[in-house]
Curated annotation (Swiss-Prot):
InterPro entries: Ribosomal_uL4, Ribosomal_uL4-like, Ribosomal_uL4_dom_sf. Keywords: Ribonucleoprotein, Ribosomal protein, RNA-binding, rRNA-binding. It comes from Bartonella tribocorum (strain CIP 105476 / IBS 506). This is Large ribosomal subunit protein uL4. NCBIfam families: rplD_bact (TIGR03953). Belongs to the universal ribosomal protein uL4 family. Residues 42-94 are annotated as: Disordered. Residues 42-54 have a biased composition (Polar residues). GO terms for molecular function: rRNA binding; structural constituent of ribosome. Residues 64-76 have a biased composition (Basic residues). Part of the 50S ribosomal subunit.
């Protein structure tokens, strides 16, 4: 299948042949959900922790004698039912990350690309580069291409002027091809790929 290549000015600059195994798959929401959940779980810090009964600073002495008081039996004042005691089954410092097979991750990326193309939310440009780092000029380019909320994926290296100009625009993310991921693709309305990015994806999934 062929994709139309556009310039930043919105003009056509030819066509690019792409593989149907990357850009024309049947949508699978279950796979996309698994990959997004895996990404967000890896990102979650997990630094929350409460003090258990072994962590609180209270005496370890028995509260009162075992028998003869008529009261319920108690030992440590650190028990969760007492004021100043430890938290029962509270959160602990841990990693929320879980495993996901590489094949599922790769399939998820191809499904995300296919979903954007089927929704007509995929734009291919010849290159992501500008002469001057002028945000106002770049905004006009984006309006000509028809988007104001997008993820832009360049080649191995991002043009520094383009990156600086785009960094001031809200709802616009710019990443090199190494950083492409399912979550960022789905969270933005449009996906903009440079010609170099498409070629890198073709090489990656060959």
């Amino acid at each position: 299948m062929d994709l139309v290549i556009k310039t930043l000015d919105g003009h056509e600059a030819g066509k690019l042949k792409v593989s149907e195994s990357i850009f024309d798959l049947v949508p699978r929401e279950d796979i996309l959900q698994r990959v997004v959940r895996w990404q967000l779980a890896r990102r979650q810090q997990g630094t929350h922790q409460s003090q258990g009964r072994s962590d609180v600073s209270r005496t370890g002495a028995k509260m009162f004698k075992q028998k003869g008081t008529g009261r319920a039996r108690h030992s440590s004042a650190r028990a969760p039912q007492f004021r100043g005691g430890g938290k029962a089954h509270g959160p602990v410092f841990r990693s929320h990350a879980h495993d996901l097979p590489k094949k599922i991750r790769a399939l998820g990326l191809r499904l995300a690309l296919s979903a954007k193309l089927k929704a007509k939310d995929l734009i291919v440009v010849d290159e992501l580069a500008v002469k001057d780092a002028k945000t106002k000029k770049l905004v006009s380019h984006f309006s000509k291409l028809g988007f104001n909320n997008a993820l832009l994926i360049g080649g191995q290296e991002i043009d520094i002027n383009f990156f600086r100009a785009a960094s001031n625009i809200p709802n616009i993310d710019v990443l090199p091809i190494q950083g492409i991921n399912v979550y960022d693709i789905l969270r933005r309305s449009k996906l903009v790929l440079s010609k170099a990015a498409v070629e890198a994806l073709e090489e990656r999934f060959r």
